[in-house]
Swiss-Prot record:
This is Quinolinate synthase. Its cofactor is [4Fe-4S] cluster. One of its GO terms (biological process) is 'de novo' NAD biosynthetic process from L-aspartate. It is an enzyme of class 2 (transferase). The gene is nadA. GO terms for cellular component: cytosol. It comes from Chlorobaculum parvum (strain DSM 263 / NCIMB 8327) (Chlorobium vibrioforme subsp. thiosulfatophilum). Its EC number is 2.5.1.72. Binds 1 [4Fe-4S] cluster per subunit. It is found in: Cytoplasm. The lineage of its organism: Bacteria, Pseudomonadati, Chlorobiota, Chlorobiia, Chlorobiales. It comes from the Bacteria. GO terms for molecular function: 4 iron, 4 sulfur cluster binding; metal ion binding; quinolinate synthetase A activity. Catalyzes the condensation of iminoaspartate with dihydroxyacetone phosphate to form quinolinate. HAMAP family: NadA_type2. It catalyses: iminosuccinate + dihydroxyacetone phosphate = quinolinate + phosphate + 2 H2O + H(+).
Length: 322
């Protein structure tokens, strides 16, 4: 039986199986839904009701009958869930799990950036804070970014941020000039062309697949570029039996689960910049997931005026990608 004063030292004595059992019971007690990103640890994905990329999770946050949303991801994801569900309790296993990409775009600096380009609309990656969303016209994810940009008239100038690599990929794919904010995801930006070529030589039968947050020098060698969900879908449908996967390796858990006969090779690290794991996503442990449900904390809150402003570009995204 769980109580609101369960302590971390007590939860740490529970086995994975015991934690999973208690989480199932708590879901019923709270009428909760657990959402987890593909980059979280396998046991958290195992506990989740829905595992997905940013777009799938945003849709799941909007379309559910739960009273409580437990979001295992990074802060902007749980914040987005709260923006979409002001009347629901939104919990997060670790509210210190931030996103350096989102943090690379401060509100005051982005506001000034927009003021430098008054005739441009701002399309911002969902990997951004509520304050940045509130300054934007449309939000997007890597799953729907190309589809959204394609709907903007060609004569309309576009500011895109905060991820410069995703913006560069979109510009080349769509032959569309955009004004780019110079942020990046440290995980994807760390992959280098030299080590990718070496991996392709070492595994000649493997297809290189990559997330568009990678640098252009890496993407040009990939046989397929897509969002986390698109990469997963590609590996299921492709006749290839082995893949070099240039994205955060948390996705390999789901890839191996869906295609148990195939081989998935994490893209190699550059020794000079070996940050190929999102440490913030990994802060969401099964123990923290359990404790946040027991204690109904940490709770995610958003100022109502900010929430209303940030909701508009998110709703616009969902409408344009329906």
């Amino acid at each position: 039986m769980t109580t609101a004063n369960d302590r971390p030292e007590e939860a740490s004595k529970l086995s994975t199986e015991e934690l999973l059992e208690r989480i199932v019971a708590l879901k019923k007690e709270l009428n909760a839904v657990i959402l987890a990103h593909y980059y979280t640890v396998p046991e958290v994905q195992q506990a989740a009701d829905i595992v997905g990329d940013s777009l799938a999770l945003a849709r799941a946050a909007e379309d559910n009958s739960a009273d409580v949303i437990v979001f295992a991801g990074v802060y902007f994801m749980a914040e987005t869930a709260k923006i979409l569900n002001p009347g629901k309790l939104v919990l997060m296993p670790d509210d210190h799990a931030g996103c350096p990409l989102a943090d690379s775009c401060p509100e005051a600096e982005f506001r000034a950036f927009r003021e430098q380009h008054p005739d441009a609309i701002a399309i911002t990656y969902i990997n951004s804070t509520a304050a940045i969303k509130a300054l934007s016209d449309i939000t997007c994810t890597s799953s729907n970014a190309a589809h959204i940009v394609e709907q903007i008239p060609p004569e309309q100038k576009i500011i895109f941020g905060p991820d410069r690599n995703l913006g560069t990929w979109l510009s080349k794919k769509l032959d569309r000039d955009m004004i780019l904010w110079q942020g990046y995801c440290y995980v994807h930006d760390a992959y280098s062309e030299v080590y990718m070529i070496q991996a392709m030589a070492k595994y000649p039968d493997a297809e290189l697949i990559a997330h568009p947050e990678c640098r252009d020098e890496v993407l040009r060698h990939a046989s397929f570029v897509g969002s986390t969900a698109a990469l997963l879908d590609y590996t299921v449908k492709s006749p290839s039996q082995s893949f070099i996967v240039a994205t955060e390796p948390g996705i390999l858990y789901e890839m191996e689960k869906r295609s148990p006969g195939k081989t998935f090779i994490p893209a190699p690290k550059d020794p000079a910049n070996p940050r190929s794991v999102c440490t913030q996503m990994k802060q969401n442990t099964l123990e923290k997931l359990y404790l946040c449900m027991v204690n109904r904390s940490p709770e995610i809150t958003v100022d109502e005026n900010l929430r209303e402003a940030a909701l508009k570009p998110i709703k616009k995204m969902l409408e344009m990608s329906a």
